[in-house]
Amino acid sequence: MEIRIRSTGQVMLEDELRRWAKDNNGPSWDRTTDDVLEALGADVVFEGPQATPENHYQFSMRQGVEQDASGRWFTKYVLGPIFTDRPATETEPAQTAAEQEAAYKAQKDATQAESVRSQRTQLLKDSDWTQVADAPVDKTAWAAYRQALRDVPTQAGFPWGIQWPDKP
């Protein structure tokens, strides 16, 4: 359970609250009840709704807590990642938020492409047996299937929208 200290706005776990109370000459207690929290000037932080990603690049990330109209505190989630302009340092050049986002998307695309290619390679390996001379299969159908697997990286939706061919 997470708890928010009213006087500081600090959010902590229950064990941290117990240590905080002890370090600040506060009380000790067995069970954390509403009465205990009120005496400590603290509130429970409830789990808020996750943000809903709209594409392959986004994810739900926590960004603090917020209070609702009834006064209860909830975890706050936003869509990430969040990019901001970064000034140059001694070791790295300045980078705009747009440049960071483009690099992030390129990295995500490359990782996804590698995963799809790995899956495609495994499917090709799994069907190698169909190409031996004495395999009791329709060689033309299996050859077409294997060619369709090789063509996966040329599909319009690659690497995120793949139409996998059906095995013969």
Regions found by a protein language model. Name each.
Residues 1-168:
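A preference for well-ordered globular domain cores
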